[in-house]
Amino acid sequence: MSEETKESSSILIWLTALSFLIGMAAIFIYVPTEQTEGAVQRIMYFHIPAAWLAFFSFFIVFICSILFLWKKEREWDIYALASAEIGVIFCSLVLITGPIWARPIWGAWWVWDARLTSTLILWLIYVSYLMLRYQTDVGSMRARFAAVLGIVGFLDIPFIHFSV
């Protein structure tokens, strides 16, 4: 890594941290408290972006898995794996922040409606994807199975989106 690249990365990290702090200040200081839901509504500033980032990450898994099966280049498999890891992190955040919001609003931590259940299924599919990647022998067969699972898993996202 060149000195210029290191400096650019350092500046980017500091700008990201500063933007995060400004965003937190805006959420907790300047944004008025919603009358019906109260302060718990502020969790939506984390919950909804986490959901979209999870969906986007799983879309990358979908595209890279198709490209891997088509071109058989390991590079696409690596991109799919990295995106799946990121997607599982954000989907986990969704499944944690959602019940925190739901308890005071609905009076229950979890309700078995279509959106919540299909989001849990999505998370389970991609956790299974990661387990497959880390528990089987290295090889093209593992990558092909994972690619198929990554493609099938993505098919749950339109169902989640339109399940309201």
Walk through the language-model features, giving the residues of each.
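Hydrophobic cores of alpha-helical transmembrane segments in multi-pass integral membrane proteins
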Residues: 9-32, 38-39, 43-106, 111-164
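Short, Lys/Arg-rich, polar N-terminal cytosolic tail immediately upstream
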Residues: 1-6
